[in-house]
Amino acid sequence: PRLRRLTGLSPLRAP
């Protein structure tokens, strides 16, 4: 559950 929150911000910050 905590990894999903980080994954949502990771893709948005990558591009």
Curated annotation (Swiss-Prot):
The keyword Secreted applies. GO terms for cellular component: extracellular region. Expressed by the venom gland. It comes from the Eukaryota. Its main location: secreted. It is found in: Secreted. Disulfide bonds: none annotated. Belongs to the bradykinin-related peptide family. This is Beta-campsomerin. It comes from Campsomeriella annulata (Wasp).
